[in-house]
A protein has these predicted regions:
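Structured mid-to-C-terminal alpha-helical surface segments
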Residues: 1-42, 52-62, 67-261
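Active-site glycine-centered loops adjacent to acidic/histidine catalytic or metal-binding residues
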Residues: 46
Length: 261
């Protein structure tokens, strides 16, 4: 991996140096995991948007959905990360990396990657959902001295489903979900009939009505976006949204949930 080149690419997009370094570490983490466990995982979530869909929103979560009956242990995954990330962190001038574990629920685990008491990012291991079986694309990566791998990622459409459900089901509305929905729709992501049926099921099972959806969309306002998006977006990107009073985010949500409003 050409570290200087990768850092420059992220900085040119508007990421700070610190966040560019985290993105490079997450790239290396994905390469290491898919090289050592080529059939075990699918990459999902916000990091996928940053790495493969040009999202400018900082995401410090590397979400891995595992396939099959048994995933590699969290210890095996952490050992893989330690071997590949430690030399890279040293080049970036970071102190020794530390890895902490957290079990969240049955068949799930979380690995925190820390340096000098600061959390850099985390790796979530979660069971693959049936809604996205077959919705996977491959990205060959040449890691130069670290070998090569084919990184398998969920496609844009199920990522849109994930964000659509997250926006409605979280206890409190998150502006980052609205931003991700807007980004994915700009990237021409859509809900296929199968994915739309899954969203319909989620809405019905959770007894979400049109008024509730409209209320949540209305909460994407200046105050919430200032608190949640300003810290994680490049200044120029945030300024454009602010100048439009964040209407593009609300409009994307209205279009997404149109038939339920």
């Amino acid at each position: 991996m050409n570290i200087a080149k990768r850092l420059t690419i992220y900085e040119d997009k508007g990421f700070s140096r610190e966040r560019a370094e985290i993105n490079v570490l997450m790239e290396a983490a994905a390469l290491a995991i898919f090289r050592d466990f080529p059939e075990a995982f699918v990459l999902f979530g916000g990091a996928t948007l940053v790495l493969y869909h040009d999202s400018l929103r900082h995401s410090a979560d590397l979400d891995l959905l595992w396939r099959g009956s048994e995933a590699p242990s969290r210890e095996d995954v952490a050992a893989c990360l330690k071997r590949d990330l430690s030399p890279l962190a040293e080049i970036l001038g970071m102190e020794s990396l530390a890895f902490e574990f957290q079990n969240l629920a049955d068949r799930e685990a979380r690995i925190y990657v820390n340096a000098t008491g600061r959390q850099l990012f985390r790796v979530d291991l979660t069971r693959l959902g049936s809604a996205i079986e077959g919705e996977v694309e491959s990205h060959p990566v040449d890691g130069e001295g670290h070998g090569s791998a084919v990184i398998k990622c969920v496609t844009k459409d199920p990522l849109l489903l994930q964000k659509a459900e997250a926006f409605l089901l979280r206890r409190s509305v998150k502006a980052r979900d609205a931003y991700d929905v807007h980004l994915l729709r700009e990237r021409r992501a859509k809900l296929t009939s199968n994915l739309r049926a899954h969203l319909e099921d989620s809405i019905r099972m959770n007894e979400i009505n049109s008024e509730s959806i409209a209320t949540r969309i209305g909460k994407i306002d200046r105050k919430l976006c200032f608190l949640e998006l300003k810290p994680i977006l490049p200044a120029d990107v945030y300024a454009l949204l602010e100048d439009s009073d964040f209407e593009p985010l609300r409009e994307s949500l209205k279009e997404l949930y149109g038939e339920w409003l």
